[in-house]
């Protein structure tokens, strides 16, 4: 945002130097990226009169001019401009002058054998917009030309200073001169002299078609003002052109210049359509009801005002007239409908478009404009009609244009709700300020002065104030903490004291934090790498329950995520496309769901085990050996064993992202922990991922609670065994529906008190087994506390285990 100080001075009284003003704005959040002193562009450039003009003896395209600069002695200057002639006043750069716009220092030189003592300048060489290729002729720029030898800077508007500000996304009010003026007034206490606006101009209603109606209501408001007695050939007054040029806008014609001026002044983009051009394009009479707002069709063509033809798609929102595209909504108008020298009637559009729609359109066509940069940040709907009325007033005053009515479709802006601002909350969050070696809390009058400077309305109550923020000024002040931040910003962050806890106490990790760190170590030890992904995702028609955020910067980051695995699979895709053999990763992060209209935030451990982990394949004779379900599940078992957790697996039936026959619900202490399983074949095919891709999503809080039980977490002494153990294998044929965890649980129960450990060592399907059965083999370790076991002591218990499996699971014994 370019802020000319001469324009700012007309809106607010400036008593500070440029440097102090720039520092104050930067400290308040409007970073000043550069200070452009326009006078430096014309330092050493004076008014000259061409007294003589002769062809160069040694060059066809050069001429030798005798120029009078009021010093008594004429200057001989070699010039290459085609429009130089006798009797014109021109800007002359004297020897020693520097032209920053082109990086030239003027020296006395000799061009093709002819001495030259200066340079006759074009507007471009002085850093100004120029429509021609020749030198600047001062008679064509101003009616009254200064005396010879006088500085040319004031005549060309090069007597100003421009601040270049970086405006953040949360401060759209900073994209207007009025917004910056209010900020300066709030910081310095200076008085404002703002243009008077009609905040509720008289208007009529119109009814668009149903599709346009929904889109216009989503934006908030769509207004059209009919203008007559327009002369498209009229140019803007010199002061208006200078303001636009200093602000970085090019002058086009009177109508367009005033719409741009109002955009820079008030922050509300406007657009003018030539009514006669619209009727020629559509072949029909154009009224307010003729306008529409819809999504573009794929491959629909659009000719922009910048001269480029764009191929649109369904992501682009367009303004139409009788369903023919005439503008990219909030971005740019069409070349066919723009104001030209032949324009006599105009529809002035003043509308609100949603930031998401404008941002999506810009990304779809690869184009950003001054208008779109404002719509993307979000604008107050209260200023839409007021800005249009401001533009009409300027056109009536300077161009003789007449208004023939205003038509509006949309809902009336709602009145602002008061925000409670508690005195205690201010003191608690900000702390005391240092005043003459004495720390004290902010006094009420300082707080009230800061809020009144923002234009707020205050109503005191026993705990503080009820604050109403005018929506036309600031849309980001909707909470108590927002107001507290504004108070601290205006008072000065550097004035608040640093308050440390007294006394300072040593820090430390809680048991839960220590357990989480141990969990991360175990996961890394199992070969998984930790990642961190963004918690914001795009909308998904398959997941309508995703929570939308109120003011997204991008359509791709407009909602809160409901799971971790979607982004994890994208990471796997990128790694495999980069020739990585596999991708094993995990993340501890939050997911967000809605229950009974309440937003729930839940910490989740999620991860992916995808394909191989290492490059070398010597152990498999160079062949790719896909990881099986049980091998992948075993990697997770290592982690749980490190936390001393016993996990039970049960068949999973209702997760459409996982393979229906190779997935399980995991339970710890009888509580559901989460899901583990192979990626569904349809998903793996669509995402071009290998079949051997396994996902897990587990409740972090459940893991931490189970791992930190005192019987697991607190270390206990257990002596090393002093007697040998006896190991026996047990193989049974059971139904495929029978889970390993159920079998192990039954074995442990039946094997007491001598059974020390049991583990699955083999699982087999196929061969001579029927298609509904499988063989599972377990290794059981028996040990007594005080003596060596003999077979006659172990066999009865082992037989008890065998019979328990036969009775509970109809198992067929194989060993």
Swiss-Prot record:
Segments forming domain B5: 414-498
One of the record's GO molecular function terms: tRNA binding
Domain tRNA-binding positions: 39-153
Biological process, per Gene Ontology: phenylalanyl-tRNA aminoacylation
Residues engaged in binding Mg(2+): 476, 482, 485-486
Xref: InterPro entries: aa-tRNA-synth_II/BPL/LPL, B3/B4_tRNA-bd, DNA-bd_dom_put_sf, Fdx_antiC-bd, Fdx_antiC-bd_sf, NA-bd_OB-fold, Phe-tRNA-ligase_IIc_bsu, Phe-tRNA-ligase_IIc_bsu_bact
UniProt-recorded name of the protein: Phenylalanine--tRNA ligase beta subunit
Cofactor: Mg(2+)
UniProt entry keywords in alphabetical sequence: Aminoacyl-tRNA synthetase, ATP-binding, Cytoplasm, Ligase, Magnesium, Metal-binding, Nucleotide-binding, Protein biosynthesis, RNA-binding, tRNA-binding
């Amino acid at each position: 945002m370019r802020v000319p100080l001469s324009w700012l001075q007309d809106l607010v009284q400036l008593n500070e130097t440029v440097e102090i003003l720039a520092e104050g704005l930067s400290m308040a959040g409007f970073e000043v990226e550069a200070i452009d002193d326009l006078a430096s562009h014309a330092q050493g450039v004076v008014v000259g009169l061409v007294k003589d003009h002769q062809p160069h003896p040694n060059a066809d395209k050069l001429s030798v001019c005798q120029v009078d600069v009021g010093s008594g002695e004429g200057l001989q200057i070699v010039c290459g401009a085609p429009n130089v002639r006798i009797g014109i006043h021109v800007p002359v750069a004297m020897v020693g002058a520097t032209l920053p716009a082109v990086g030239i220092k003027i020296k006395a030189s000799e061009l093709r054998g002819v001495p030259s003592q200066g340079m006759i300048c074009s507007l471009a060489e002085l850093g100004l917009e120029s429509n021609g290729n020749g030198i600047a002729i001062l008679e064509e720029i101003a009616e009254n030309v200064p005396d010879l030898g006088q500085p040319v800077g004031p005549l060309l508007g090069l007597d100003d200073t421009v601040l270049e500000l970086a405006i953040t996304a949360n401060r759209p009010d900073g994209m207007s001169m009025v917004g910056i003026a209010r900020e300066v007034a709030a910081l310095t206490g200076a008085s404002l002299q703002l243009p008077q606006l009609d905040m509720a101009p008289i208007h009529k209603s119109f009814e668009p078609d149903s599709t346009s109606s929904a889109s216009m209501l989503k934006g908030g408001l769509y207004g059209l003002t009919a203008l007559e007695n327009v002369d498209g050939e009229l140019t803007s007054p010199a002061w208006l052109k200078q303001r636009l040029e200093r602000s970085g806008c090019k002058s086009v014609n009177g109508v367009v210049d005033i719409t741009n001026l109002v955009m820079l002044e008030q922050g509300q983009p406007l657009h003018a359509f030539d009514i006669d051009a619209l009727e020629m394009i559509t072949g029909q009479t154009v009224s307010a009801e003729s306008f529409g707002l819809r999504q573009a069709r794929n491959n629909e063509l659009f000719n922009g005002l910048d001269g480029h033809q764009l191929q649109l798609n369904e992501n682009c929102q367009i303004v139409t007239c009788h369903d023919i595209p005439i503008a990219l909504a909030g971005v740019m108008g069409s070349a066919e409908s723009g104001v030209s020298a032949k324009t006599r009637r105009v529809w002035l559009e003043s509308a609100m478009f949603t930031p998401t729609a404008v941002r999506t359109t810009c990304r779809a066509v690869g184009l950003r404009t001054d208008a779109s940069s404002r719509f993307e940040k979000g604008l107050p709907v209260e200023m839409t009609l007021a800005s249009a009325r401001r533009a009409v007033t300027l056109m009536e005053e300077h161009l003789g244009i007449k208004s023939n009515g205003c038509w509006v479709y949309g809902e009336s802006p709602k009145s602002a709700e008061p925000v409670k601002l508690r005195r205690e909350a201010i003191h608690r969050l900000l702390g005391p300020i240092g005043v003459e070696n004495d720390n004290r809390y902010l006094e009420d009058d300082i707080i009230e002065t800061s809020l009144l400077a923002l234009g707020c309305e205050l109503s005191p109550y026993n705990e503080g104030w009820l604050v109403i923020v005018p929506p036309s000024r600031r849309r980001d002040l909707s909470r108590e903490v927002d107001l507290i931040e504004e108070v601290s910003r205006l008072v000065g962050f550097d004035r608040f004291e640093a308050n440390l806890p007294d006394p300072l106490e040593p820090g430390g990790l809680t048991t839960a934090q220590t357990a989480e760190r141990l969990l991360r170590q175990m996961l890394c030890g199992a070969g998984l790498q930790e990642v961190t992904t963004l918690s914001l995702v795009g909308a998904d028609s398959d997941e309508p329950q995703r929570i939308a955020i109120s003011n997204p910067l991008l359509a791709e980051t407009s909602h809160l995520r409901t799971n971790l695995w979607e982004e994890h699979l994208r990471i796997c895709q990128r790694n495999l496309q980069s020739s990585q053999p596999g991708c094993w990763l995990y993340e501890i992060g939050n997911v967000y769901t809605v229950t009974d209209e309440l937003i729930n935030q839940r910490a989740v451990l999620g991860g992916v085990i995808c394909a191989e982990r290492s490059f070398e394949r010597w152990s498999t004779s160079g062949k790719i050996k896909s990881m099986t379900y049980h091998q992948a599940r075993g990697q997770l078992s290592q982690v749980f064993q490190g936390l001393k957790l016993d996990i039970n697996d049960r068949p999973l039936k209702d997760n459409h992202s996982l393979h229906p026959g190779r997935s399980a619900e995991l339970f710890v202490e009888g509580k559901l922990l989460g899901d583990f399983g192979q990626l569904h074949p349809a998903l793996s095919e669509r995402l071009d991922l290998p079949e051997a891709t396994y996902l897990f999503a587990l409740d972090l809080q459940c893991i931490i609670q189970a791992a930190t039980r005192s019987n697991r977490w607190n270390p206990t002494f257990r002596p090393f065994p002093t007697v040998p153990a006896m190991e026996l294998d047990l193989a049974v044929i059971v139904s495929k529906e029978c889970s390993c965890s159920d079998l192990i649980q039954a074995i442990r129960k039946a094997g007491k008190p001598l059974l020390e450990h049991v583990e699955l060592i083999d699982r087999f399907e196929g061969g001579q087994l029927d298609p509904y059965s499988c063989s599972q083999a377990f290794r059981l370790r028996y040990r007594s506390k005080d003596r060596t076991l003999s077979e006659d002591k172990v066999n009865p218990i082992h037989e008890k285990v065998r019979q328990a499996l036969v009775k509970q699971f109809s198992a067929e014994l194989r060993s």
